[in-house]
Amino acid sequence: MKIYLAGFKGIQNHFNKSTKDIYLLSSFWEHKGGRYKDYVMQKKHILDSGAFTAINDKTGKYKNFDWDIYCDKYISFIKKTKQKLFFELDIDCVVGLKKVEYYRKKIEDAIGIAPIVCWHQNRGSDYWIKCCEDYNYVALGTTTATKIGKKIRSNPWSLKWFINHAHNNNAKIHGLGFTSTKWLRKLNFDSVDSTSWLSGRYGSIFKFKNQKLNQYNPKNKRVKDWYALHIHNFVEWVKFSNFAEKNF
């Protein structure tokens, strides 16, 4: 299993080691201004469309967003940075599924590679079955922001149906934001992504030891150097990611 660590941009100017052997996820939204570093073009990188960020913008700035233009820019960025793995624009709640399928086809036709299809509860189980038959890489949304997401998180065994159906159709499956260290050993996703290493912002400290990633929350302590803590946690998650790739 591959664990892609998201949110690296926050420490990119403070992490002085090579990332070429680290699985990273970044969002087009982070780079849409045209600025990005080499890690975006490395082999072990997966690109998110950034659509979720735009949809959930609290300022209302993107209420009347032109998704046609955004899709065109997304395609241009994928081409320019030679991405091999990238997600579709899963914006069903804004433009509807038919438009999402239109954008998916547009991206595939322009790049020559199908984007990773992102299933959410509104699409229904039949749509998951069809996607597993039609695409070789699919993603499963389990965010707690939705009712079904909360239900799944409370009973992760329910994910087995999705995982098994994907594998039975020779499709790879990605768990969007699913990195429960307890359940990753039990659920055979092909890949997942996580920002959990950034929970240092809440004072959490991670330590990979004896094949386990442990989380500590020291009480009555103040963080003197936030970047040092984030980098420490990032390194420990990289260790866990390396272990997971070989053993999960």
Go through the PLM ranges and name each one:
Residues 44-46, 105-113, 153-183:
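Alpha-helix-loop-beta-strand connector modules within alpha/beta enzyme cores
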Residues 201-248:
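C-terminal accessory extensions appended to soluble enzyme cores
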Residues 62-65, 125-130, 179-194:
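Catalytic cores of alpha/beta
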Residues 30-40, 93-106, 123-127, 145-164, ...:
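Active-site-adjacent beta->alpha loops and helix N-cap segments on the catalytic face
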Residues 117-149:
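Histidine/lysine/aspartate-rich catalytic loop segments that bind and position anionic ligands
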